[in-house]
Amino acid sequence: MRLSKYYIPTLKETPTDVSVTSHVYSLRSGLIRQVASGIYAWLPLGLKVLKNIENVIKEEMNKSGILEVLMPLIQPASLWQESGRYNDYGSEMLRIKDRNNREMVFGPTHEEVVTDLLRTTLTSYKNLPLILYQVQWKFRDELRPRYGIMRCREFLMKDAYSFDKDFNSAIESYNLMFKVYIQIFRRLGLTPIAVKADSGPIGGNLSHEFHILANSGESTLYYDQDIINLINNDNIDIEKIKNTYTAADDLHNSETCPIPASNIKTSKGIEIGHIFYLGDKYSKTMNAAFSQNNETQLLHMGCYGIGVSRLVGAIIEVSHDNNGIIWPEEIAPFKFSLVNVFSANKECRNISENLYAKLDSNDVLYDDTEDSTGIKFSRMDLLGMPWQVIIGKTTIEHGLIEVRQRSSKKSLLMSTEQFLNNFKKS
């Protein structure tokens, strides 16, 4: 993609009402723009990142046999009244009426809808276990939206729901989703710390939050230092991970902690996912059941959420420097930024154009503008593509291009042929 043809409204200065790094860089790099308090428009560059994260999530879910659906954003209030949760979200849940004066809600979550879906469509216990997921926009009227896309009112979420015939099978589904979450976060370049958590208005008696370590996090985490190695191990052992001590500040007690204080690490964390075993909380109140051996039994359920749009902010929080964002390669909007620092030089221009023509335009952002070298480098550092390909003086004098890694700032000199052979298919 040619920068001259792309729309990236960058900002030179940081807005005065912005505090956290992810909010600063998501505005300055032209990922988003605020439309109202806690509500953002996603611009071309930001939307590419959002879609790349969504694709990673879908790939991991799909290869684990989890089926994608799409449920309605507007839901009948009657389902929430039936489940007993209509008042649980208070003013956070937006309530509306249609032209027939029927009460509807703008869904903050989808437990009621998916339970209703299964109770009306499940025909046999042989369809169990079953896990369904969707990637859907949601709305919660936060009292104090802040930190940009980290805590906003409208957000993109991946939510999944499991249905099983008994407790043991439900825990197997829970553990499967636990493992899938670790795989997703690792592909995104993150090391998730799973901590036992309160279930809140979602319900159930077992839940884990997934956090990443970040100084800007709102939660304080306490964890056995061995958990990092377990999370990063190629062979993910869910039982070992679940049995290794981790706790957020609301559940940690230093006096009753079962491991030595010398083994405990403390850090701030950002929540990026949450999983719940719900039991029969919804199936009982909404009569979602199946029949086996002429006996009617309630479904055992679980639910599992990842804040997709929140992940964009969380990744920036842990992957940046003083110059801008450092995108992990898996989700970067472009893999390469191609920079011609001598745009007035015919030879440099021809080399840049020829190289650009040989690259996939979806993989490269080509700065073909007439801006100064300093502006070009500052802009590319801000935007954070993993690799910067620089055409300049060395190219003219020695026939070599400079390939600079954004994260390490290390550079390699090579011919265009070497670059294409080494990087194009990597």
UniProtKB/Swiss-Prot annotation:
Pfam families: HGTP_anticodon, tRNA-synt_2b. Keywords: Aminoacyl-tRNA synthetase, ATP-binding, Cytoplasm, Ligase, Nucleotide-binding, Protein biosynthesis. One of its GO terms (biological process) is prolyl-tRNA aminoacylation. GO terms for molecular function: ATP binding; proline-tRNA ligase activity. PROSITE patterns: AA_TRNA_LIGASE_II. GO terms for cellular component: cytosol. It is found in: Cytoplasm. Its main location: cytoplasm. Coiled coil: none annotated. Its EC number is 6.1.1.15. It catalyses: tRNA(Pro) + L-proline + ATP = L-prolyl-tRNA(Pro) + AMP + diphosphate. PANTHER family: MITOCHONDRIAL RIBOSOME PROTEIN L39/PROLYL-TRNA LIGASE FAMILY MEMBER, PROLINE--TRNA LIGASE. Belongs to the class-II aminoacyl-tRNA synthetase family. ProS type 2 subfamily. Homodimer. Catalyzes the attachment of proline to tRNA(Pro) in a two-step reaction: proline is first activated by ATP to form Pro-AMP and then transferred to the acceptor end of tRNA(Pro). This is Proline--tRNA ligase. It comes from Ehrlichia ruminantium (strain Gardel). The lineage of its organism: Bacteria, Pseudomonadati, Pseudomonadota, Alphaproteobacteria, Rickettsiales. The gene is proS.
